């Protein structure tokens, strides 16, 4: 064999070996792969089953490809390299859930409609949410409990100059615009964080995280407690220390597993409270504290924006209970003896308030009904379930029946006497298995014994000055 041919064959063999090794590298590194589902805010593909429901899984290889793509060794580094190239070379976001803004800012894509003033709530949805919050407030007031509602503004609501130019704002009203007006109309005690933050020349949200800083959380805390009837500590002399060690959520969505290097402002506070029971993280569904320096007992319904504020509240109250679960369990007031309730929700999730009613005993109402139209043949939905100590009856009323200010009552009849319970005007989208939120719903939590002992139940709707009735069989 000529020498030149031999050298060529050797090079060819070396090339083949290198190629095979490169192909096998991701497979060999599988044991080193890690779960990045939390950082990417999605569930990674599971390893497929060969059989499903006793039959051969014909999608096995497609599902295996998805699993391997999500779990191959070194995937996070390849994703990071691709993301960096897209962001810094092409000026594009590699993650459809993240908006690449100006000046290195990142925004959550789910806030785009709010930014553009494209409301996901109808006007009646907004009114229904405000009525629900007013009913929650009345429930608290009747028990001598203070109530405050607040909304954590989206980052691009406060700092629009850092949004990309191709995101255009319309002249319409956002969910928050509509709801703020309805809260005022129905007299709901509202801590307006949007107005407070807009007054500040300093940015209190992190450029590459969707939340406010601890310093921004302090501003929110002060705004909220200033709406309460009793005075609480404002931590007026607190100082903040800057450290570049924060685990920014939007960065993790772009760069899963990236080091924690974003700037955070940490408060210099010595806390006296202690956490009851086990504590895992700020995202625990329930955090209970005792021994705070202040007075009173707090029940706070919160989301991830509460991660940087709950310690302030825990210190300001002797006892506190922070809950992330929905529906909001307002009956917890009696269990813990709370004298204050705060409900905080981020702007982008306001639509959720129209889709799930709080869990509390429905208020009794005095009504005189002489006659009502039977609408049981209309396009209504009525369903029920047992929910803890409650009998939960919910559904929807035929849309053509309803005006913008409808009310729904559950009638419990026993021994010829009728008791009226007002339902929340909430459409239980998840329970009704609807793909979208509607604005013609009702949801009512009755004490279980009321439903059990009643001779009959019915649904009474008041709309356009008329009464409409739907009999219900338990």
Describe every region a protein language model picked out.
Residues 2-474:
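Extracellular glycan-modifying ectodomains
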């Amino acid at each position: 064999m000529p020498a030149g041919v031999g050298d060529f064959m050797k090079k060819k063999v070396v090339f083949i070996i290198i190629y095979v090794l490169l192909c096998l590298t991701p497979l060999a590194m599988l044991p080193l792969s890690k779960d990045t589902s939390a950082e990417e805010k999605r569930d990674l593909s599971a390893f497929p089953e060969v059989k499903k429901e006793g039959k051969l899984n014909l999608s096995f290889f497609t599902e295996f490809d998805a699993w391997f793509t999500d779990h191959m060794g070194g995937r996070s580094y390849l994703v990071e390299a691709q993301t960096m190239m897209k962001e810094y070379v092409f000026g594009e976001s590699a993650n459809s859930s993240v908006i690449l803004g100006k000046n290195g800012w990142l925004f959550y894509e789910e806030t785009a409609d709010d930014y553009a003033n494209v409301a996901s709530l109808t006007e009646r949805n907004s009114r229904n949410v405000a009525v629900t919050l007013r009913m929650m407030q009345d429930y608290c007031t009747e028990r001598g409990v203070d109530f405050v509602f607040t909304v954590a503004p989206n980052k691009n609501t406060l700092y629009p100059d850092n949004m990309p130019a191709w995101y255009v704002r319309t002249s319409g009203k956002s969910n928050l615009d509509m709801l703020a007006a309805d809260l005022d109309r129905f007299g709901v005690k509202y801590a307006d964080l949007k107005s407070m933050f807009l007054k500040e020349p300093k940015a209190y949200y992190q450029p590459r995280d969707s939340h406010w800083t601890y310093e921004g959380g302090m501003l929110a805390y002060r705004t909220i407690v200033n709406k309460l009837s009793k005075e609480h500590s404002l931590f007026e002399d607190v100082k903040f220390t800057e450290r570049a060690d924060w685990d920014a959520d939007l960065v993790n969505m772009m760069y899963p597993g990236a080091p924690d290097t974003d700037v955070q402002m940490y408060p210099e506070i010595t806390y006296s409270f202690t956490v009851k029971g086990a504590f895992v993280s700020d995202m625990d569904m329930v955090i209970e504290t005792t021994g705070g320096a202040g007075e009173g007992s707090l029940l706070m319904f919160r989301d991830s924006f509460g991660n940087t504020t709950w310690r302030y509240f825990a210190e300001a109250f002797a006892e506190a209970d922070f809950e992330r679960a929905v529906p909001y369990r307002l009956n917890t007031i009696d269990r813990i003896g709370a004298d204050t309730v705060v409900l905080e929700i981020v702007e982008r999730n306001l639509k959720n308030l129209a889709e799930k009613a709080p869990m509390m005993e429905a208020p009794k109402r005095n009504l005189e009904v002489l006659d009502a139209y039977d609408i049981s043949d209309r396009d209504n939905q009525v369903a029920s379930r047992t929910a803890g100590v409650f009998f939960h009856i919910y559904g929807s009323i035929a849309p053509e029946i309803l005006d913008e200010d409808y009310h729904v009552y559950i009638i419990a009849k026993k021994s010829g006497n009728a008791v009226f319970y007002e339902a929340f005007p909430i459409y239980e989208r998840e329970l009704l298995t609807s793909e979208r939120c509607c604005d013609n719903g009702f949801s009512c939590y009755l004490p279980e014994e009321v439903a059990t002992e009643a001779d009959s139940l019915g649904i009474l709707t008041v709309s356009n000055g008329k009464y409409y009735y739907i009999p219900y069989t338990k």
